[in-house]
Design a protein with these regions (language model features):
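Outer-membrane beta-barrel translocator domains and adjoining extracellular loop/strand segments
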Residues: 1, 41-47, 124-132, 174-180, ...
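Transmembrane beta-strands of outer-membrane beta-barrel pores
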Residues: 2, 6, 16-18, 32-40, ...
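Short loop/turn motifs that connect adjacent beta-strands in outer-membrane beta-barrel proteins
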Residues: 17-28, 43, 109, 156-158, ...
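Transmembrane beta-strands of outer-membrane beta-barrel proteins
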Residues: 26-32, 112-116, 147, 161-163, ...
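Outer-membrane beta-barrel signature, preferentially recognizing the C-terminal barrel domain
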Residues: 83-96, 140, 169-228, 238-265, ...
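Gram-negative outer-membrane beta-barrel transporters
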Residues: 225-228, 244-337
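Conserved small/polar residues in nucleotide/adenosyl-binding loops
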Residues: 355-359
Length: 359
């Protein structure tokens, strides 16, 4: 494989502080950003082939020596190039953005960050379908606006409530779009892109309560809701023998849940230098499809119903000693979306990634 990526970017930011009064000191931020990426990709494919008496005598060979020098010849096993036009592509990616944001405060208790970002995005792709015959010429562009609001209210020095909203975009990566087929050793499957992928958009809302009992200690509990339009998911692709995966857009999806964060020093029980950290979340997600579709509502691909991260940390600066013990647990999730049929008994089921634990 020969992969060449060239990129260039530039940015300009400006900030202005206003002194309206002692209780109101807003800050205005604005700026622009530009980025250009160009990719050239070429790959060559080789396969082992067998001719002549090789087929007749293959069953007699010792499998441990199939590829020995004695068996590599034009009438036994030899390498043959199978490269076609779909193994090469070129792509250009242009992003231009401008933003304006304001930091607002009303006294010492209420603070707000509000802003909007405008982005122009263009993607060009030239290549071939996996058959190496049909050319692919892609030219996508979109102009989007992404507003955001973050409001924090300080109940007192130790307690704070935060409310946030933001809109974001998930643009398909090169590997998710280009029709190039590559083999994933971890999945034991071929993976190819989908030139018809659309950008995925998300509207995110969070409500959090934050408690700071002492410096360096936090307790945060919050709820969140996310709405996804055109979420990108990895799916099974019917392609004859062997496994092959690709990517597609679902119609829309929702996710909501609760999250708890704790950071607590254990000095109060005589364990100086030892701290406890916990992060846990429960997430309920659901993907929805158009009425009449063979697809059935399910959890989002790649989304676990719960996450647990916890650990103990020891720090002794005088002795130069630090140590930690960590525990992570992730609930089972859909690794790859299957293929639904008109008759549910003929479905190709989803592939699940079961519970993952690391210590």
């Amino acid at each position: 494989q020969d992969l060449k990526d060239n990129s260039a970017s530039t940015a300009l930011n400006y900030e202005h502080k206003f002194a309206v009064s002692e209780m109101f000191t807003p800050v205005l931020n604005t700026g622009v950003y530009g980025e250009f990426k160009k990719r050239n990709f070429d790959a060559r494919r080789f396969v082992y082939n067998m001719l002549g008496s090789g087929y007749d005598r293959f069953a007699e060979w010792d499998y441990s020596s199939v590829f020995s020098d004695a068996n590599i010849s034009t009438d036994r096993i030899y390498m043959k190039e199978s490269t076609n036009k779909s193994d090469s592509y070129t792509s250009d990616n242009l992003l231009g953005a401008a933003y304006v944001a304001a930091k607002l405060n009303w006294g010492e208790r209420l603070n707000a960050n509000v802003g909007v970002r405008m982005e122009y995005y263009q993607l060009k792709l030239d290549g071939y379908e996996s058959d190496g015959i049909k050319p692919v010429h892609l030219d996508q562009n979109a102009t989007d606006f992404f507003p955001s609001v973050n409001i924090a209210y300080n109940l007192n020095e130790k307690h704070q409530v935060r409310l946030a909203y933001g809109r974001s975009v998930n643009r398909a990566e090169f590997r998710e779009i280009v029709p190039y087929v590559y083999y994933d050793f971890a999945l034991d499957a071929n993976i190819t892109g989908n030139v018809n992928l659309k950008n995925a958009y998300a509207n995110n809302m969070d409500l959090r309560y934050e408690f700071y009992p002492t410096p360096g200690e936090t307790v945060t509990i919050g709820g969140f809701y996310k709405r996804f339009d055109n979420p990108i998911e990895q799916t099974y692709m019917e392609a004859g023998s062997g496994l092959q995966y690709t990517y597609h857009n679902a119609d829309h999806a929702n996710a909501f849940g609760v999250e708890l964060d704790i950071k607590k020093n254990l000095d109060f029980i005589g364990l100086k230098g030892l701290s406890f950290v916990f992060n846990g979340a429960y997430i309920h997600s659901r993907v929805y499809f158009a009425e009449g579709s063979f697809e059935r509502d399910r959890a989002m691909q790649g989304q676990s119903p719960y996450l647990i991260n916890t650990g103990l940390f020891y720090q002794n600066d005088n002795a130069g000693i630090s140590a930690s013990a960590l525990y992570n647990r992730i609930g089972k999730r859909i690794e790859t979306v299957g293929v639904p049929k008109q008759n549910p008994n003929d479905d190709i089921p989803d592939i699940l990634s079961l519970i993952h634990i690391s210590e």
